[in-house]
UniProtKB/Swiss-Prot annotation:
Organism: Saccharomyces cerevisiae (strain ATCC 204508 / S288c) (Baker's yeast)
GO CC entries: cytosol; mitochondrial inner membrane; mitochondrial intermembrane space; mitochondrion; nucleus
Residues that hold heme b according to the record: 123, 146, 177, 219, 223, 376
Phenotype upon gene inactivation: Inactivation of this gene leads to a deficiency in L-lactate dehydrogenase activity and consequently to the inability to use L-lactate as a sole source of carbon.
Entry's Gene Ontology BP terms: lactate metabolic process
Name of the protein in question: L-lactate dehydrogenase (cytochrome)
Amino acid sequence: MLKYKPLLKISKNCEAAILRASKTRLNTIRAYGSTVPKSKSFEQDSRKRTQSWTALRVGAILAATSSVAYLNWHNGQIDNEPKLDMNKQKISPAEVAKHNKPDDCWVVINGYVYDLTRFLPNHPGGQDVIKFNAGKDVTAIFEPLHAPNVIDKYIAPEKKLGPLQGSMPPELVCPPYAPGETKEDIARKEQLKSLLPPLDNIINLYDFEYLASQTLTKQAWAYYSSGANDEVTHRENHNAYHRIFFKPKILVDVRKVDISTDMLGSHVDVPFYVSATALCKLGNPLEGEKDVARGCGQGVTKVPQMISTLASCSPEEIIEAAPSDKQIQWYQLYVNSDRKITDDLVKNVEKLGVKALFVTVDAPSLGQREKDMKLKFSNTKAGPKAMKKTNVEESQGASRALSKFIDPSLTWKDIEELKKKTKLPIVIKGVQRTEDVIKAAEIGVSGVVLSNHGGRQLDFSRAPIEVLAETMPILEQRNLKDKLEVFVDGGVRRGTDVLKALCLGAKGVGLGRPFLYANSCYGRNGVEKAIEILRDEIEMSMRLLGVTSIAELKPDLLDLSTLKARTVGVPNDVLYNEVYEGPTLTEFEDA
C-alpha cells in the first residue's frame, strides 16, 4: 500500500530538506514498486512517456491553450501535417530576430518561419503569448498542445514565409518552462516518473491522484486539481457521499451480478463514464485525450468517453484513436459567442459519429480558481515583471485564458434552437437546482447532468448528489421521471459512490479528475486500470448490498437522514485528506 508521505510542505529555503524529501519520495516509490515486475508493454509505454516529459515544460502555452479547441474546431482533416512550401528561399535567424515587435511579428515553428502580425488580434489565447515571443523559435510553446494542421486553417499561405536557415541561437529559442519550479524540481519529477510502481500495485483511484501530485508540473497540477475560491464545494462534492449510508439486504443469491445499463439509447458495460476534462496533454504530452479513448475501449470493459471542447487533441484525432467503431463517445460543448463556429462544430462532430451533445451551462464566467491563478501566466524569462508594462491580466491563470470564447449570454432559447439544428440527443451539463431539471424536462432535452463543474465555478454550490436526492422524488411526483435521463458527477472516487447515485435515480455517473490522473501517470493502460478498479468495486459492493442488477438499486437501500446535515462531522476519509492539497496564501518574493 502506498504510504502517503506529508512531503508537500518543504521549506523552499532549505536545500537539505529538499534533498531529504526527494530521497524519501524516491524510496517510497522504489519500495512500492519492488514487488511486481513491470510488463514489457508497460515498460515501453513508460519509457516513451519519460522521454516525452521534457516537452511539457511550457508555461506560456497555458494562455495559448484557449486556442487548442478553438483552432481544432474546424479540423476536418485527419492529415495533421501543415502544407508548407520547402522550396521557398530560406530565411536566416538574424532576419527572423529583426521582426520582434507586435506590429512586425515573425516566429519559427518546427523549422519554418511565419508572419503572425495580422493574426495577433485574433488569437483566442490573447496577443501576449505570441507578442512576448516575437522573433523567436516558439516550437516548445506551440507543439505540445496544437494539432499541426491548425496552421493551414488560420495562417494565410503568403504568411508562411519559408524554411529557417539553420537554427535560432539559444537565446532566441523559447525554452521548455515550468512556472514555480526549479531545474532540480523538474529533474526530481522526471526521476519519479521513471520510478512509477507497476499497475498491479495500484489498488484504488487515490493512488493515481497521489502519484500525479508528485510527478506533474506545478502548473499542470494546479490546473487539474484546483477548485473555486476556498474550495468548499470542491470538498463538499466528495464529503456529501460520506453522509449517505447503506441498508444492505441479506440472504440473496449474488453469484451473478450484472452492472451493465443503458445511457442515451446505447447499451453500456458499466454505469459510469469518463467526463470531459480539458488539456489532457498537460499530463500526457504524447497522446493526451487519444490515450483516454484507447483506455476506454481497449479492455474487456468499454466505457463511454465524453470529449471536451477544450481537449488538447482535435475531435478527429480522439475519435480515430478509439479502438472500436462501436465505442461510445459523446461531445461536451461550450457555446461560442460566434454561433457559426458552434454550428459548424456540431455538424462536424455529428458527422464524426458522436452519440450525444452535452452542453455546458454552468460557465458563463470562469470561477476564481486560485491555485491555478497563483501560478501566474508568464511568457518570457523576464516573467511577470516584464508583463507589468502591458495590460495583460497577469493573474488570469490557465482557466481564465481558456474561457475567452465562451458565450455568457446563453439562454434556454438557445438550447431550444440547438435542438432544431441536430439529430443528436442534447444533455444540459451543469444543472444545480431542481427547478432547472423540471424546465429541462419540459423543453424536451434528452437529459441533464447534475454538476457544479467539479467545484470549479461557484463556491458553496450544493453537492450534485444532494441535488439528485432532492430532485428525483419531485420528477416522479410530476410524472417527469421518464422524460429525461439524469446524470451526476463531482466528487466520485469509489464504486460505493456510484452505487449511492444509482440508488437515488441517476442514469449514469461521471468521473473526470481520476481519469486525468491515471492518464497522466500511465497513459491508456492507466485509464484501463482505473476502469477495472471502479468496475470491481461496484460489483463487490453490489454483492454486499444484496442486489444483482442496476435495476434493483433503489432509494430504500440508503439511509439519507444525515445527507443535509452539513454541520455534522463525516467519517474521516484518510486517503482523500492525504492527497487533497488546498489553496495557499501568497508568499513574499525572494530577495
